[in-house]
């Protein structure tokens, strides 16, 4: 690999992909009437949504190759993809992945408690629907616990799937990735989406995917990864105002790292060995959407998910019930509802201080929000949520947010919102102790939720015909952070572990703050060429504890993304993308953290999409065009070098 040395072949590919056709292009101008549902629980124009929100459209997703959702999120302001290789995760506004809530059609999903200690980054994204099933991705930056409860401290990612059609239709995508460096593993994938009516009132939807990534012959590189999923939905239209849906799905992830290939071959505690991890997720859900004439619209669901880490004999069953009613009352749009969650963890391997293998917990919550149209151009949203947990008691999460449409072009947004994360099951269980190289970790029943208060102000400009810009400033106070400290001998009686490390337990002690700015620009250069870009500045600092003065996470302060799209002809679209990741901040500290600072890097990708027919489209791209090297010695993770992608989409 080279540091950044564009070869003649690379430059030829760039020019060929970006300027491979010449003709007057069709009008690419579009109106900015993007609708979102995550910010308030009902559909509204994005400019009026009471939150900082970004949308990745289906068109954006279709134009190129994404390994998973993390790749698609790299262009979203405020979002940082942490780690590398097949252990990436998502940070929003400087908060760790544990503080990002992931939803699919508004339904929460998480399997993190099947992966204690390291949390197994890179797994959560594998449970998400395949590309062909996704209509759009909505990303809220900042806390949203008033509507969504625990975990929504950093932000919320909501995957919106495609709706049923009145006639049978579908899509299939086949793709392959070929690495220029033959020590890196190639990848093959296929995903599909099919929907259609079974009768006048009953419709069916089925989607799934299979992906195989070969193992690198690079130490600390990508392991062998196999991903498979299948989901089916039945929709029954009871009458014009009420609909029932039954959903069921199965997913599997198998990951293997071998010594001599991607697994560490030296410096291990004891003998370095191969790893073989098998994760499974099964889920079933029933939901109802109703239009109660003269009252409002309701959305109710009951979901059960079973997540299993077969390799470590761990499983967690999550049962969630949520019901929301949105009711217009004069100048008010009132949203209120209830939510309940039951967690049941079975872990036969990680507890080393007692015979206990099962933990469970139940949470209930009530919430209410009101969007009040105080004037024709000004709306004020305020609300609160009361959660009750049998472990820590009750917690209240308020928020207030204003949206002011200065005129048809300018909008000002701002407000104060709160978030919290409830302690995980192992963290609050007194007779539970996990093995850790930095000291065995004991549970603490006195833990309270981690909390945050976010303040933000945004200025948005949009012509409605393609030109749009925004600037957002935010400040987040993070309190009661759960951290590990030395455990008193009268509580942790076992003493040092086999590595000589003294026992630890978790307490609410640390405080931190994050602040920064986010900017976006979309600019139609001509009728056929459009530029879009985003910039993120993030600063974080721990205000207390052993690592006061250090950042909350080891993240870059500066991120920049730019994308150029050219609708070359009616059938041909060319694009190029630049992604800059700045030098990382100082390490956040801790026994398991590397004490070095990863330098900056820039990736440039380019590709084309060509419609062979009305139903068949071929796509090609070169990723990491200039073969920028990101290796373990300098960065702490490995990224792929130059690689070539070829995809075929078929619609029917």
From Swiss-Prot:
Molecular function GO terms recorded: siderophore uptake transmembrane transporter activity
Superkingdom per UniProt: Bacteria
Major localization class: membrane
Annotated localization: Cell outer membrane
GO cellular component assignments: cell outer membrane
Alphabetized UniProt keyword annotations: Cell outer membrane, Ion transport, Iron, Iron transport, Membrane, Receptor, Signal, TonB box, Transmembrane, Transmembrane beta strand, Transport, Virulence
Residue interval(s) of motif TonB C-terminal box: 635-652
Sequence ranges assigned to domain TBDR beta-barrel in this UniProt record: 167-652
Residue positions of motif TonB box: 33-40
Limits of the TBDR plug domain: 45-162
InterPro entries reported in the protein's UniProt record: Plug_dom (IPR012910), Plug_dom_sf (IPR037066), TonB-dep_rcpt-like (IPR039426), TonB-dep_rcpt_b-brl (IPR000531), TonB_box_CS (IPR010916), TonB_rcpt_b-brl_sf (IPR036942), TonB_rcpt_CS (IPR010917)
Pfam families noted in UniProt: Plug, TonB_dep_Rec_b-barrel
Signal peptide: 1-25
Topology in membrane: Multi-pass membrane protein
UniProt-listed CDD domains: ligand_gated_channel
Family indicated by similarity: Belongs to the TonB-dependent receptor family.
Anything else known: Regulation of the irgA expression is negatively regulated at the transcriptional level by iron.
Annotated function: Involved in the initial step of iron uptake by binding ferric vibriobactin, an iron chelatin siderophore that allows V.cholerae to extract iron from the environment.
Protein name in UniProt: Iron-regulated outer membrane virulence protein
Natural source organism: Vibrio cholerae serotype O1 (strain ATCC 39541 / Classical Ogawa 395 / O395)
Gene assigned in the entry: irgA
């Amino acid at each position: 690999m080279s540091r950044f040395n564009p070869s003649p072949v690379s430059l030829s590919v760039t020019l060929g992909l970006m300027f491979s056709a010449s003709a007057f292009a069709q009008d690419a101008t579009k109106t900015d009437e993007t609708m979102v549902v995550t910010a308030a629980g009902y559909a509204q124009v994005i400019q009026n949504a009471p939150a900082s929100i970004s949308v990745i459209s289906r068109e954006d997703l279709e134009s190129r190759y994404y390994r998973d959702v993390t790749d698609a999120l790299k262009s979203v302001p405020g979002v940082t993809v942490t780690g590398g290789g097949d252990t990436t995760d998502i940070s929003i506004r400087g908060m760790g992945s544990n503080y990002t809530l992931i939803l699919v059609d508004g339904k929460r999903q998480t399997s993190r408690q099947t992966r204690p200690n390291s949390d197994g980054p890179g797994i959560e994204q594998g449970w998400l629907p395949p590309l062909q099933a996704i209509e759009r991705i909505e990303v809220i930056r900042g806390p949203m616990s008033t509507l969504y409860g625990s975990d929504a401290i950093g932000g919320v990612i909501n995957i919106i799937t495609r709706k049923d059609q009145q006639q049978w239709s579908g899509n299939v995508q086949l793709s392959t990735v070929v690495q220029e460096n033959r020590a890196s593993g190639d990848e093959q994938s296929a995903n599909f989406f099919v929907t259609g009516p079974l009768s006048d009132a009953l419709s069916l939807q089925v989607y799934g995917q299979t992906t195989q990534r070969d193992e690198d012959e690079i130490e600390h590189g990508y392991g062998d990864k196999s991903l498979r999923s299948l989901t089916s939905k039945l929709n029954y239209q009871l009458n014009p105002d009420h609909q029932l849906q039954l959903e069921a799905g199965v997913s599997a992830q198998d990951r293997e790292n071998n010594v001599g290939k991607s697994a560490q071959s030296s410096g291990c505690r004891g003998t370095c060995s191969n790893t073989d991890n098998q994760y499974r997720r099964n889920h079933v859900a029933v939901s109802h959407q109703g239009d109660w004439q003269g009252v409002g619209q309701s959305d109710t669901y009951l979901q059960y998910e079973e997540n299993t880490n077969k390799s470590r004999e761990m499983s967690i069953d999550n049962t969630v019930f949520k019901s929301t009613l949105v009711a217009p009352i004069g100048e008010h749009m009132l949203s209120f509802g209830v939510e309940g969650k039951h967690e049941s963890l079975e872990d036969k391997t990680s507890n080393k201080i007692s015979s206990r293998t099962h933990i469970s917990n139940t949470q209930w919550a009530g919430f209410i929000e009101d969007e009040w149209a105080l004037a024709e151009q000004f709306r004020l949203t305020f609300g609160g949520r009361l959660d009750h947990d049998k472990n820590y008691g009750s917690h209240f999460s308020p928020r207030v947010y204003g949206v002011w449409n200065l005129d048809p072009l300018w909008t000002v947004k701002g407000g104060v919102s709160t978030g919290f994360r409830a302690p995980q099951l192992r963290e609050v269980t007194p007779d539970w102790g996990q093995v850790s190289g930095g000291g065995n970790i004991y549970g603490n029943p006195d833990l309270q939720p981690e909390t945050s208060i976010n303040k933000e102000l945004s200025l948005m400009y949009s012509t409605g015909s393609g030109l749009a810009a925004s600037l957002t400033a935010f400040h987040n106070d993070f309190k009661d952070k759960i951290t590990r400290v030395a455990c008193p001998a009268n509580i942790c009686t076992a003493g040092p572990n086999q590595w000589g490390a003294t026992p630890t337990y978790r307490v609410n002690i640390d405080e931190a703050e994050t602040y920064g700015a986010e900017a976006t620009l979309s600019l139609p250069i001509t009728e056929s060429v459009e530029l879009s870009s985003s910039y993120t500045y993030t600063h974080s600092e721990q205000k207390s504890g052993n690592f006061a003065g250090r950042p909350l996470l080891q993240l870059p302060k500066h991120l920049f993304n730019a994308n150029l799209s050219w609708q070359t002809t009616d059938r041909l679209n060319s694009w190029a993308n630049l992604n800059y990741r700045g030098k990382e901040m100082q390490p956040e500290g801790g026994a398991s953290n590397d004490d070095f600072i990863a330098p900056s890097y820039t990736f440039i990708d380019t590709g084309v999409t060509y419609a062979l027919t009305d139903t068949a489209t071929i796509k090609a791209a070169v990723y990491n065009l200039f073969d920028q090297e990101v290796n373990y010695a300098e960065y702490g993770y490995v990224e792929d070098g130059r690689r070539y992608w070829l995809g075929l989409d078929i619609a029917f």
